[in-house]
Structure formats: structure tokens, C-alpha cells
A protein has these predicted regions:
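N-terminal low-complexity or amphipathic/hydrophobic leaders
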Residues: 14-90
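Buried hydrophobic positions in well-ordered alpha/beta secondary-structure cores of metabolic enzymes
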Residues: 37, 126, 187-189
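Flexible, glycine/charged-enriched surface loops at secondary-structure junctions
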Residues: 44-50, 220-236
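General beta-strand structural signal in soluble alpha/beta enzymes
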Residues: 46-49, 106-108, 116, 134-138, ...
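Extracellular/luminal Protease-associated
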Residues: 95-137
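A contiguous pocket-lining binding segment that forms or flanks enzyme active sites
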Residues: 136-137, 143-191
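A hydrophobic, small-residue-rich beta->alpha segment in the mid-to-C-terminal subdomain
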Residues: 188-230
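Acidic/histidine-enriched, glycine/proline-rich intrinsically disordered or flexible terminal extensions
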Residues: 228-265
Length: 265
């Protein structure tokens, strides 16, 4: 008897992350997020080696819905496992049909890109269900379609080989490794043009606060360096530079004024 098909894979988390926090995180840069997480003692939260299949659909933030793969086995992972849904050998379909609005399907493909973790059909279905993104540390097929799909899809590369060649979906909504980073169900993933950062759920709201401030400060510092000022005394900012930043904000925060406005001594 199939005990998996039709099961509810949604998890009730102790820490709520408001939709407003998710929206704010979409505007936070990966550089600021990883720096602030490093200051909290989390030294590697960035998924190294992954890129968006469509560079125009790279920005997202959402809660992790995890999928774990193991190596395929020839007597189990045959074309017959793609029988009509539901069936116990096709948990990948279970994931796509259970993922919630605003969630990110995060796939542990063991960093193995030899066979596609998914093609364009599954991300298209996820988009229609309101999911936020799909992320794998493996590869995709249907690269030309994904390059046009207005839905964030991150992976290593494009290959044509079917998932069944090397991957079996073993479990859903369990802790996984993706691109060398631990991802737990409910963690918050943020993607921008540079890549993806994993934020422990309980730190999401704090990261939104810290990174908004950091990104604003970094933009100010880039105006000053771009105007010809040396790094020393500007970047990283000294107390005096931070005071100048506050004075610049109070004066209207115009980019052209950044090299000129200074705090009163």
C-alpha cells in the first residue's frame, strides 16, 4: 500500500516569518547577507557554483521545501517509475504538487550534474502553483525553455540526460545538503544575480533589518570611492565616515552630494 502519495508535507514552524520580511529580503544583496551572517558565526551560507537559468528571473526569497536524492539503482529507477501520479516511486511529483505558495524547492543532487534534476515542465507547474523558485546543486534539462521561463531556476548547468540515469528521489522535507550548505525545511533562501544565500529561519527578520542598513551604507561608500576618494578612511567605514553618512542622509541622500557633505565637527 502506498503510504506516501497524497501525504501532506507542509511543516508548522515555531518561528513565523511574515510575508513583509520575505519581500524585504528580496532587496538585500547576497554580499550583505553573507557578511551579516558571518558576523553571527555562520561562515558559509552561500550556495557556491549555482547560476540562474534565466538571468532576468534571478531575484527571489522564500521558504525551503527540501528534496533529497540518492544514486539511482537500475532495478528500481526505470522509465516505468514515471507512471501516472501518484505512485511511491515518484516523490518528485509529490514535491511539485505539495509545495506551497512562496516556497522554494531545494534539491540535494549530491553536487552531481550528470543527469538533470528536472526539466522545464516541473518549474512551469511550480510557477502556476505560486512557488518562489527551484534550486538544485545538480543540473537541469530543457535549458532553452528555462532561459525564457519567468521563474527563478538555479543549478550548475544544462544537460540532456534524464534524472533516472543517476538520481532517485529518496525523501522530502528533511535536512539536506545543497552545494555544500546545510538546508533545513523552512530555512529562508534569497537569490539575486550573484547567487543564493541560506538564512536560518529564526534570523530572517534580523537579517532584513541589518542588510537593509548595510546595503544603504555600501551604496553611499561606493559613491565616495567612485568620486575618487581612497579606500583608507572610507571603506571599511570609520566612525567619522558613518557620521558623514548620517549627515548625507539627513541632507536628502542625493548620490552627487555623497563626496561633499560632511558631519559637523
Amino acid at each position: 500500500m502506498d503510504m506516501t502519495a497524497g501525504r501532506n508535507y507542509q511543516i508548522k514552524h515555531e518561528v513565523e516569518v511574515p510575508a513583509s520580511v520575505i519581500e524585504r529580503l528580496k532587496n538585500c544583496s547576497s554580499g550583505s547577507l553573507t557578511t551579516e551572517l558571518f558576523k553571527k558565526g555562520l561562515r558559509q551560507c552561500f550556495l557556491v557554483g549555482l547560476k540562474p537559468m534565466n538571468s532576468n528571473a534571478a531575484i527571489f526569497a522564500g521558504e525551503a521545501f527540501t528534496l533529497r536524492m540518492i544514486p539511482a539503482r537500475e532495478d528500481l529507477d526505470t522509465i516505468e517509475t514515471l507512471k501516472p501520479y501518484p505512485n511511491p516511486h515518484n516523490l518528485q511529483w509529490e514535491a511539485v504538487e505539495n509545495i506551497g505558495k512562496g516556497q522554494v524547492l531545494v534539491i540535494d543532487s549530491r553536487n552531481d550534474p550528470r543527469a538533470a534534476s528536472a526539466g522545464a515542465m516541473l518549474p512551469t507547474r511550480m510557477k502556476m502553483r505560486g512557488a518562489a523558485a527551484i534550486v538544485t546543486d545538480g543540473s537541469f534539462r530543457d535549458g532553452q525553455e528555462l532561459a525564457k521561463l519567468e521563474f527563478p531556476a538555479y543549478g550548475q548547468m544544462v544537460v540532456a540526460s534524464t534524472r533516472l540515469s543517476y538520481h532517485r528521489v529518496a525523501d522530502l522535507q528533511v535536512p539536506i545538503a545543497c552545494a555544500g550548505v546545510a538546508v533545513y525545511p523552512g530555512d529562508i533562501l534569497v537569490g539575486d544575480g550573484d547567487g543564493i544565500t541560506v538564512i536560518p529561519r529564526h534570523l530572517a527578520a534580523e537579517m532584513a533589518d541589518l542588510c537593509e542598513r548595510r546595503d544603504e551604507l555600501e551604496k553611499y561608500l561606493s559613491y565616495r570611492v567612485g568620486a575618487g576618494e581612497p579606500l583608507y578612511g572610507v571603506y571599511p567605514p570609520t566612525d567619522a565616515t558613518r557620521a558623514d553618512f548620517a549627515a548625507w542622509k539627513a541632507a536628502g541622500a542625493k548620490p552627487e552630494d555623497a563626496p561633499h557633505i560632511r558631519a559637523e565637527k
